[in-house]
Every structure is written in structure tokens, then in C-alpha cells.
Amino acid sequence: MALEFLAATRGMDNLVMSCSVTLLFSSSLSFVLAIKNLTKSSFVVSKDKLPIQTPYLFSSFFFFFTTSPDSSPVGVLIVDSSPWASFSEAPDFFFSASSLYSSIDLGSILYFAFNSSRVTLPLLKRRFCFFDRGMELFRSISISSSAFLFFVGSSKAFLTCSSLSFFVTASSFDSSVSDILSQIIESCWV
């Protein structure tokens, strides 16, 4: 897992914006390529387990930024999540640091949760329509939305559901992984 501080002090707004634009561009390209690959794939829905994890076109990044009293960005932390096999490998501060706010890629959270633990959720499987390479498209959309939210300076997290066309929001990351996932799942059951 690659951790890299891009900005640690104030006065780095240009760098923050550059990183946001770069991610937005790369995720947009990933989205286009994912659609292209998706057209070549067939639907594969399993009754007992979710489809096997497929390679990604681009690594997924989580953007964090701390805020000063006047809410201006102070720092940016990029976490490359591509090597994560399960939540146990995630750094402790990822879900516990109350001083960090993020426009986080919740698509990746769901993806790694479902594929690493092979969770069977019949209702979610029907509503989200899991299929081969479908999650690649799903993640591309969520990455794009995360990049956009970071660009506009949002401190909330949004999950874009292409099949349901609604947003799930989470304003606090002080909870445990299970709490966050349970909130998301409960929202999906509505």
C-alpha cells in the first residue's frame, strides 16, 4: 500500500486542485474504458457468492484533507487501495481519525467488503445486479463522483449507484467499518 503526503501545510491550494483535476481526468478515462469492456462482457450472477474480483484499469485512490478553523484545506493524504485484500489491512486511522474528512470512494469499500468476505446479500445482489466487470464500471462512477466531491471541497461521502440512481451519504467516519457498512446496507434496503 502506497501512502503519500502531497500537501502538509497551508498555502498548497493549487496542488490540491491539481491533484483533484488529475484524478477526475484519470477516473473519467477509466469510466470510458470500463464501458467499452462492459459491452464485451456477459451477465454472471451467482446465487451463492459474488463474482470473482476482476483487475482494475486504474488504481483507486482515497483523498483525505484536514481543515483549519476557517475550513480551508490544510493537507492531503492519498492512499492507494489497490493492494488491499481485506479491511484488516487498512490503516487504523482510516476509519477512526475524527480530524479527517473525506470524499471517499465508497464503491471500493463495498467492492472490497463483498469480494473479500464473499458476503451473500440476495436483495443487494438483485438490486445492484452484480455481474462480471459490472463492478468495474460501478467503481469508475463512484471514483469520478469522489473526485468531483473532493474538487468542490465537500466533507461528506457519496456513493453513486448507477442501477438505482440514488446517493447514500455518510457524514462521519468515526464509526467502525461494520457500522459504516451497516448504515449503507440499511439505506439500500429502503
UniProtKB/Swiss-Prot annotation:
- Subcellular location field: Membrane
Coiled-coil annotation reads: none
Query: What is the species listed in this Swiss-Prot or TrEMBL entry?
Result: Saccharomyces cerevisiae (strain ATCC 204508 / S288c) (Baker's yeast)
Q: What is its main location?
A: membrane
GO terms for cellular component: membrane
Query: Any other noteworthy remark?
Result: Almost completely overlaps NOP13.
Q: Where are the transmembrane segments?
A: 15-35, 58-78, 94-114, 148-168
Q: How does it sit in the membrane?
A: Multi-pass membrane protein
User: Keyword annotations for this protein?
Assistant: Membrane, Transmembrane, Transmembrane helix
Q: Does the keyword Cell cycle apply?
A: no
> Per its record, how is this protein called by name?
Putative uncharacterized protein YNL174W
